[in-house]
Amino acid sequence: MNNLVEIVIPAHNEEYNIPVIYSAINKALAKTNYTFKVLFVDDGSTDGTLHAIQDLSNHNDNVIYISLSRNFGHQNALKAGLDASSADIVIMMDADMQHPPSLIPALLKSHEEGFDVVYTVRKDNEHISFIKKYTANMFYSLMNYLSEIEIEPGSADFRLMNRKTLDALLLMPDQEIFYRGLVKWIGFKQTKIEYEPQARHTGVTKYSTKKMLRFAITGIATFSNKPLYFAAYMGFAFAILSVLYIPYIIYAFYSGTEVHGWASIVATLAFFGGIILMMLGIVGIYLGKLFEQSKNRPQYLVKAAKL
């Protein structure tokens, strides 16, 4: 059995977390039979993250790194690390210490039991705000309803993959990446481990509300075309209702009945205008995804590396 584990950690403005997470990983794996190396991916940080990584690498042979030319986003930074990984066992996790390194031995134990992918599911605790719990559950419920895959609420980008599954994952040509969905989509033998997220060690979250919303839209648009059918069905339903209203208008015209309700007509027109704009927005999102895919630009650019 190959006992080398490669841990891929994307980092954006995590200067003070870099030495902390490395120390925690070192402690977690000290009593195992595995050797490890840590691949940090500096995702265009503007603080001293790259310097902290380089300093760690200069003093530890098992620390390697990639520095991207700008901030390409968490999923693309993960891809950069996965593309460069060479070990038969790869673990991906975040640098903020909310993915506990102490869980790594449990991931490896499940791998030894024959699982190709060991993913983690976050248990809600006091470190997770009510709004985040509610919006996350709403997203996963909607995602599972609309798509052909099922992602458990609380799923995280903290997982172990063997080389077979990682090679399959890297075959995916998606320009906009949603790894939580892609890992489920490729199949293979998978199992989960639950964990309680810790409080962020230092710094602030890099996922703003805007980024989280875009992440959710990417996930749904990547794995489901049901919103397009929803737009078509709604248009068809309103067309039927409009047709059913025509006989009444004809009857009123020939019977001399005055039809009142200008306010309701204006409100109805405004309502339908909103519906039309919403439908155009749904179609526009899918067209935008196709446009991004057709450009075929690289998902990241490397400024410096030590591998």
Can you annotate each of these PLM segments?
Residues M1-I128:
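Structured catalytic core of nucleotide-sugar glycosyltransferases
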Residues I25, G81, D96, V118, ...:
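Residue-level signature of catalytic and energy-coupling elements of molecular machines
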Residues V38, A52, N62, L68, ...:
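Residue-level recognition of specific faces of alpha-helices
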Residues N58, D83, K109, E113, ...:
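Solvent-exposed polar/charged
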Residues L68-R70, H74-A84, P101-Y179, Q198-I217:
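Acceptor/aglycone-binding surface of glycosyltransferases and processive sugar-polymer synthases
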Residues F178-L307:
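Hydrophobic helical membrane-anchoring modules
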